[in-house]
Amino acid sequence: MARKSIRGKEVVMVSDDDDDDDDDVDDDKNIIKCVKPLTVYKNLETPTDSDDNDDDDDDDVDVDENIIKYIKPVAVYKKLETRSKNNPYFLRRSLKYIIQAKKKKKSNSGGKIRFNYRDVSNKMTLKAEVVENFSCPFCLIPCGGHEGLQLHLKSSHDAFKFEFYRAEKDHGPEVDVSVKSDTIKFGVLKDDVGNPQLSPLTFCSKNRNQRRQRDDSNNVKKLNVLLMELDLDDLPRGTENDSTHVNDDNVSSPPRAHSSEKISDILTTTQLAIAESSEPKVPHVNDGNVSSPPRAHSSAEKNESTHVNDDDDVSSPPRAHSLEKNESTHVNEDNISSPPKAHSSKKNESTHMNDEDVSFPPRTRSSKETSDILTTTQPAIVEPSEPKVRRVSRRKQLYAKRYKARETQPAIAESSEPKVLHVNDENVSSPPEAHSLEKASDILTTTQPAIAESSEPKVPHVNDENVSSTPRAHSSKKNKSTRKNVDNVPSPPKTRSSKKTSDILTTTQPTIAESSEPKVRHVNDDNVSSTPRAHSSKKNKSTRKNDDNIPSPPKTRSSKKTSNILATTQPAKAEPSEPKVTRVSRRKELHAERCEAKRLERLKGRQFYHSQTMQPITFEQVMSNEDSENETDDYALDISERLRLERLVGVSKEEKRYMYLWNIFVRKQRVIADGHVPWACEEFAKLHKEEMKNSSSFDWWWRMFRIKLWNNGLICAKTFHKCTTILLSNSDEAGQFTSGSAANANNQQSMEVDE
């Protein structure tokens, strides 16, 4: 043991050659004895003189710093290293482990860059982050160096402004990030974020120190599947599943009938009563199943309904022996009385009334006097205070051309203005039908209206098919409905005499007031008959009357002079003054109208959504010709892109051509991310392969562009090689590199991203 003094301090030296120490002393005791670090002992081995004037004060400071660094002697670290073989806990405390950790830390410090996120004015740092391996903090792509990171940030994240600083003594490499003023000016940031100068720049990134390689096969995530109930009523539906869809307003379609034979009942029960107004009334009669008067002694009938919309004291005629279907009467007036119904059975008889003081007389089972009852219940219409304007058919100018006036028809007296009778299309109104031909003359005498005088012309309208001006006898098996607008018509008593039929008919012909212009009776084309038909069946019949206080003579059952009666009842038709128009088939027009209505009905049953906002839109917006908001036209964008490139100076035509094709391709295929670029390069090479082969300058600019993409890390060498191989290969072999077919600039394709 030796004693030496260092700067006035006494240090104890322990040597292995000392005779006083035993060889069997434990290592722990030696560790306890060695209380000084290794540098102290090394300094003690060199001879030092405390009186030497050549030593400087700086050497004393270095020795003290070395002593402070090492808190344990070398033997302690050696002992910890040997013990760490059995217990890994001691490994991190050994000297070798600490030295390796420091070297690793120094080697890794070269790839760290600090990002300072500043406000718009670049005056205040809002947030700071340190990334490793020269990685981008936004997309986490390693750029390989300071220069590569600089190129990547400027090209891929152009919404921000970057300022780069090299590493110096006081700090490492840093990057200041701030939002460009143009980003706020052109509305990239929303207005609801408040003042962007006071709001910090927020972004999402992962801590790269915590990323580890994990085996997905061992760590399989178990998903907890939660099944939610789906409300089927909120889903859009079509018309195939017999359901109704509501767009914006609470609109519902009328109920559907399982049989086409019940359509008339559904329509009559769902029609709303329309209040009277001071405006002129414009009645309109549609095509199919138009209201007809009751028919006497009809069997196997379907859906008989009477719809009356009159003013005062209107009575509906009775029905005799109606069987096997619903009979419904719809009354919407005041003080209406219904005459008796005779012997109706086998179905529901329903009466729907929305008026006041409605009374019904008792029913009878007699069916012989039905025609007599009809004659007594026909009211007349009071003259209106204002002229009635009715819809005039566009085909009225063709009627007089096809049918000329007959010699047996009487001439019509002149009137101040022409009165045109207008009749609608199918199954048009006809007078009530009798049980046999013997009663045809009786019905005709009672159903001829008198035309009242008016200052304005009355234009009733009748369209084409199956029109008859005389009654049909013994019809059955179809829908029957009567719509009447008449008031206070008294009918005279009936007689059973048949001798004076011609005299009766002459007295019951409608009296037409004198006028200065002729009256024109207008009837449409198809299947028009001016004579009565016996035993006609399976067609709808309706009567619409607008008469004023006409007395009806008694009826007879004679049928001998029917032809003479009809000859006296037909008025003459005047020639129209309108120009001739070529006849168009009514059936073709009806077919086109029905197809259009069916198409619109199918569209109304669907729910449409906006292509960009994904919000439901109404059917009117779908059918409108206006464009939706923020929608752009590709053709207009192509023209603007071409004009923008034409303004460039110092650029060749081939380069402009290449830039135009690439920009159009990127916009139409929606290449918006860095991961889409490899797929876009391959598909662009396939699309313009032939043009690149024919033009060397085009191929040159394409190669230069790929080199720039490769330098910036947007494509890899594998993608570069694929593009070159596509250009050198035949057209049949070009499609084997990607999963999709050849690209098309106007169609979207599936994308493959380089890993």
From Swiss-Prot:
<feature type="region of interest" description="Disordered">
    <location>
        <begin position="276"/>
        <end position="590"/>
    </location>
</feature>
<feature type="compositionally biased region" description="Basic and acidic residues">
    <location>
        <begin position="321"/>
        <end position="333"/>
    </location>
</feature>
<feature type="compositionally biased region" description="Acidic residues">
    <location>
        <begin position="15"/>
        <end position="27"/>
    </location>
</feature>
<feature type="region of interest" description="6 X approximate repeat B">
    <location>
        <begin position="267"/>
        <end position="582"/>
    </location>
</feature>
<dbReference type="GO" id="GO:0008270">
    <property type="term" value="F:zinc ion binding"/>
</dbReference>
<feature type="region of interest" description="Disordered">
    <location>
        <begin position="234"/>
        <end position="263"/>
    </location>
</feature>
<feature type="repeat" description="B-5">
    <location>
        <begin position="505"/>
        <end position="521"/>
    </location>
</feature>
<feature type="compositionally biased region" description="Basic and acidic residues">
    <location>
        <begin position="455"/>
        <end position="464"/>
    </location>
</feature>
<dbReference type="Pfam" id="PF09733">
    <property type="entry name" value="VEFS-Box"/>
</dbReference>
<feature type="repeat" description="B-2">
    <location>
        <begin position="374"/>
        <end position="390"/>
    </location>
</feature>
<feature type="repeat" description="A-7">
    <location>
        <begin position="461"/>
        <end position="483"/>
    </location>
</feature>
<feature type="repeat" description="A-8">
    <location>
        <begin position="484"/>
        <end position="504"/>
    </location>
</feature>
<feature type="compositionally biased region" description="Basic residues">
    <location>
        <begin position="390"/>
        <end position="404"/>
    </location>
</feature>
<feature type="compositionally biased region" description="Basic residues">
    <location>
        <begin position="474"/>
        <end position="483"/>
    </location>
</feature>
<keyword id="KW-0539">Nucleus</keyword>
<comment type="similarity">
    <text>Belongs to the VEFS (VRN2-EMF2-FIS2-SU(Z)12) family.</text>
</comment>
<feature type="zinc finger region" description="C2H2-type">
    <location>
        <begin position="136"/>
        <end position="157"/>
    </location>
</feature>
<feature type="compositionally biased region" description="Basic and acidic residues">
    <location>
        <begin position="298"/>
        <end position="309"/>
    </location>
</feature>
<keyword id="KW-0678">Repressor</keyword>
<protein>
    <recommendedName>
        <fullName>Polycomb group protein FERTILIZATION-INDEPENDENT SEED 2</fullName>
    </recommendedName>
</protein>
<feature type="repeat" description="B-6">
    <location>
        <begin position="566"/>
        <end position="582"/>
    </location>
</feature>
<feature type="repeat" description="A-5">
    <location>
        <begin position="352"/>
        <end position="373"/>
    </location>
</feature>
<feature type="repeat" description="A-6">
    <location>
        <begin position="422"/>
        <end position="443"/>
    </location>
</feature>
<feature type="compositionally biased region" description="Basic and acidic residues">
    <location>
        <begin position="416"/>
        <end position="425"/>
    </location>
</feature>
<feature type="compositionally biased region" description="Basic and acidic residues">
    <location>
        <begin position="346"/>
        <end position="355"/>
    </location>
</feature>
<keyword id="KW-0804">Transcription</keyword>
<keyword id="KW-0677">Repeat</keyword>
<dbReference type="Pfam" id="PF23320">
    <property type="entry name" value="Zn_SUZ12"/>
</dbReference>
<feature type="repeat" description="A-3">
    <location>
        <begin position="307"/>
        <end position="329"/>
    </location>
</feature>
<feature type="repeat" description="B-3">
    <location>
        <begin position="405"/>
        <end position="421"/>
    </location>
</feature>
<feature type="repeat" description="A-9">
    <location>
        <begin position="522"/>
        <end position="544"/>
    </location>
</feature>
<keyword id="KW-0479">Metal-binding</keyword>
<feature type="repeat" description="A-1">
    <location>
        <begin position="245"/>
        <end position="266"/>
    </location>
</feature>
<feature type="repeat" description="B-1">
    <location>
        <begin position="267"/>
        <end position="283"/>
    </location>
</feature>
<feature type="compositionally biased region" description="Basic and acidic residues">
    <location>
        <begin position="234"/>
        <end position="248"/>
    </location>
</feature>
<keyword id="KW-0862">Zinc</keyword>
<keyword id="KW-0863">Zinc-finger</keyword>
<dbReference type="InterPro" id="IPR019135">
    <property type="entry name" value="Polycomb_protein_VEFS-Box"/>
</dbReference>
<feature type="repeat" description="A-10">
    <location>
        <begin position="545"/>
        <end position="565"/>
    </location>
</feature>
<feature type="region of interest" description="Disordered">
    <location>
        <begin position="199"/>
        <end position="219"/>
    </location>
</feature>
<comment type="subunit">
    <text>Probably indirectly associated with FIE and/or MEA. In plants, PcG complexes are probably composed of a member of the EZ family (CLF or MEA), FIE, and a member of the VEFS family (FIS2, VRN2 or EMF2).</text>
</comment>
<keyword id="KW-0805">Transcription regulation</keyword>
